[in-house]
């Protein structure tokens, strides 16, 4: 119900859902958003999987032969990510997404790992990153800020909405990085940005 409820809440605000088009959580996301607000990116496998009935036959359903092209579409065409507990494929997609964000190889986007009520899947996973991966220097402590772990659907929705409250988009023009905002920062806010992040600028300031 979490995937369905979250997708329904986002669709009500004009968002569209894109999932792997399979059964279970993937189907729940499309059911919640509704066929008219959904895309499906299925994978062709010898023993599975048929697209779920909520998207089957829809022109917004595509089928991929390779997992890597499927991941490319899911990441490239999404403005936010909500990940629920799953198997190797879920973890593979999650780690690739975080690696791309960590290294600036994809656009900044909000990422939420949605825990089942009372569950420990993502909490234990996050603890493993914090206690085993970060202390060894394989990731930085601040890499854990790339995502939010919660079991609250409303908090997940708020995280995605809040990310785009002022941020609009980002792009490179030659050697210049342009960040588009809905509201320009005040002089005081700009001064603080230069204090906190001015070292990111090759010359001058932000």
Spans of features found by a protein language model:
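SAM-dependent methyltransferases
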Residues: 146-147, 153-206
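Short, acidic/small-residue loops that bind anionic groups at enzyme active sites
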Residues: 38-49, 84, 98-125, 141-142
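Glycine-rich beta-alpha loop segments
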Residues: 1-43
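Conserved thiamine diphosphate
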Residues: 73-83, 132-151
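Glycine-rich oxoanion-binding loops at beta->alpha junctions
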Residues: 1, 43-76
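Glycine-rich, charge-decorated loop segments at or immediately adjacent to ligand/cofactor-binding or catalytic sites
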Residues: 25-30, 119-133
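Active-site/ligand-binding-proximal alpha/beta "capping" segment
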Residues: 64-112
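Short acidic-hydrophobic, aromatic-tinged amphipathic segments that line or gate anion-handling sites
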Residues: 60-69, 145-156
């Amino acid at each position: 119900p979490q995937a369905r409820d979250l997708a329904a809440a986002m669709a009500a605000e004009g968002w569209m859902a894109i999932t792997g088009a399979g059964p279970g959580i993937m189907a729940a996301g499309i059911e919640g958003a509704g066929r008219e607000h959904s895309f499906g990116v299925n994978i062709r496998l010898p023993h599975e999987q048929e697209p779920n009935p909520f998207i089957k036959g829809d022109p917004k359903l595509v089928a991929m032969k390779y997992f890597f092209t499927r991941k490319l579409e899911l990441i490239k065409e999404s403005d936010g990510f909500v990940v629920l507990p799953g198997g190797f494929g879920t973890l593979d997609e999650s780690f690739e997404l975080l690696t791309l964000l960590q290294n600036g190889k994809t656009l900044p986007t909000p990422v939420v790992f949605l825990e089942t009520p009372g569950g420990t899947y993502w909490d234990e996973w996050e603890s493993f990153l914090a206690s085993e991966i970060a202390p060894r220097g394989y990731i930085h402590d601040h890499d854990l800020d790339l995502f939010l772990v919660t079991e609250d659907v409303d908090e997940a929705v708020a995280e995605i909405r809040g990310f785009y409250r002022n941020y609009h988009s980002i792009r490179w023009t030659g050697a210049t990085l342009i960040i588009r905002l809905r509201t320009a920062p005040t002089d005081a806010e700009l001064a603080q940005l230069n204090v906190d992040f001015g070292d990111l600028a090759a010359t001058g300031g932000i």
